[in-house]
Curated annotation (Swiss-Prot):
GO CC aspect terms: ribonucleoprotein complex; ribosome
Subunit structure: Part of the 30S ribosomal subunit.
NCBIfam families in alphabetical order: eS8 (TIGR00307)
Family: Belongs to the eukaryotic ribosomal protein eS8 family.
InterPro entries in UniProt: Ribosomal_eS8, Ribosomal_eS8_CS, Ribosomal_protein_eS8_arc, Ribosomal_Se8/biogenesis_NSA2
Residues passing through the membrane, by range: none
Record-level Gene Ontology MF annotations: structural constituent of ribosome
Biological processes, Gene Ontology terms: translation
Source organism of the structure: Thermococcus gammatolerans (strain DSM 15229 / JCM 11827 / EJ3)
The protein's name in its UniProt record: Small ribosomal subunit protein eS8
Record keywords, A-Z: Ribonucleoprotein, Ribosomal protein
Gene name for this UniProt entry: rps8e
Length: 130
């Protein structure tokens, strides 16, 4: 069944709202990309969006652009340590904005939206030695 992002057909009281028009194609939504950590190679999907534009969805990510002090490096993603969007996402290795990922050079926080941008950008976390 399609995901519809139009107005709800229920009133706050629970009563029904009768639409004065049909549902429009522009009101359709899509399933989330749920970008995972790749095993061997990255996988992208190009989708058509409203107005004929294109959006690149990152389905499987192998590398991340990690920035530290203005310098960026392309490093391999090892796994997802924590994900504040959903605690099950860390277990399933799903990357979203705000997720903490383990890379070759240390832990980093994802600053991009991989399902919308098609790339994983992250900022390196400072390791605290206590």
């Amino acid at each position: 069944m399609a995901i519809w992002q139009g107005r709800s057909l229920k009133k706050p009281s629970g009563g029904r709202i009768v639409l004065a028009r049909k549902k429009r194609k522009r009101e359709l939504g899509r399933e989330p990309a749920n970008t995972r950590v790749a095993e061997e190679r990255e996988k992208r999907k190009i989708i058509r969006t409203y107005g004929g534009n294109r959006k690149v969805r990152l389905v499987e990510a192998l590398y991340a652009n990690v920035f530290e002090g203005g310098k960026g490096r392309k490093v391999k993603i090892l796994n997802v340590v924590e994900n504040p969007a959903n605690r099950q996402y860390a277990r399933r290795n799903i990357i979203t904005k705000g997720a903490i990922i383990e890379t070759e050079i240390g832990k980093a926080v994802v600053t991009s939206r991989p399902g919308q941008d098609g790339v994983v950008n992250a900022v390196l976390l400072k390791e605290e030695n206590a």
